[in-house]
């Protein structure tokens, strides 16, 4: 049996951020980070589909404590993984990380004020605090709609979350079902890999924010020349964050104007044979769903090649040669990719762990969320989620620091346990836990997640 102060479960962006802040702001605190996979990095080392990259700029995506050195403002997954590896090594965190170690169960005892955690290998770790940084979706189960007749298709049918690295698209006809961040990333990448044709088959359009791919712009050069590399980079980071906040606020306050602006931009970028009003005019408002980043307008550039196209219709059924749309059109393909999103964790945020407090199993709907990082009736447990309308890392860094402040406060006052209490909170005061966006996968999992206390100032 091993005894430590803090156990972090998950070694993606949030887990690495938590490890850094504990090592820096909680001196003398013993901790470990468990990762069930053989490689750290979370999403960025797990997904393998062509073109996988950030859907936000690297200034805001990078940690506040680690400068991003790559030349691209939009980074591919391999650069992100290298960045995370460098961050871990530069700050001496690798000694605390244990790969290939999953957590089966965790039980809290109020008598001892400790968590007892059991790993898949049968090991036991006793800790004071448990931090969950396992994300929000299921790794093993992507969101796959029930497409009729998919077993009849004679070609290759894959989900983007389960992309086989050996799959060769050169000379092949490809259909990508979906129009979100994954689809807008894959379509240009598939063209670059030599696909004969790529059809983006979307049930409904999305908004695309076109931004430059390279960060060596005039603003950064001027700031670094005036204030030096470190301060100039810091200023550029916050200017970029402010720009994103302004775009989001504009979309919320001036909904009609924001919608028309994005549609007008799509009209300018579309080639003549693509009808922007049909394929790039969503029925919802800007930022009602996450905005898709299109670096250098690569999706529109792919459309201009004539090898990529967009079809706006639903999938009626699969046929032997491809997909039949609701309008009766048969789209022939050698490869069909379902880029239809993620399946959220059930019993969030416990992932696949069995969790109990004093012998009572955790059941999400019976708990309230406190400040977007704790759960009522579950002592000494924190979870970390990023933003849905900005870079994930910004909130992950902030919540990791908040955790450190809380355990330091407990230490200064001789306390051993912290537990949000829902006493006095009526059922009518609860609001659904929904990550603020209406994306299909988020709303599907709302029933399996704890409600928010209506007066909670910090929902996720």
Predicted regions and their residues:
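Beta1-alpha1 glycine-rich phosphate/pyrophosphate-binding loop at the start
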Residues: 4, 8, 13-97, 202-203, ...
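Rossmann-like dinucleotide-binding core of oxidoreductases
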Residues: 3, 7-8, 13, 17-33, ...
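Feature captures the FAD/FMN-dependent oxidoreductase FAD-binding
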Residues: 71-138, 317
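Glycine/threonine-rich phosphate-binding loop and adjacent beta-strand/alpha-helix elements that clamp
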Residues: 49, 197, 335, 339-410
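C-terminal catalytic lobe of FAD-dependent flavoproteins
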Residues: 254, 261-321, 325-351, 430-460
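Glycine-rich beta-alpha-beta "Rossmann" dinucleotide-binding loop(s) and their flanking helix/strand
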Residues: 130-161, 193, 305, 331-364
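Short beta-strand to alpha-helix junction loop
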Residues: 68-86, 98, 177, 250-259, ...
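Short hydrophobic core segments
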Residues: 9, 103, 124-137, 174-177, ...
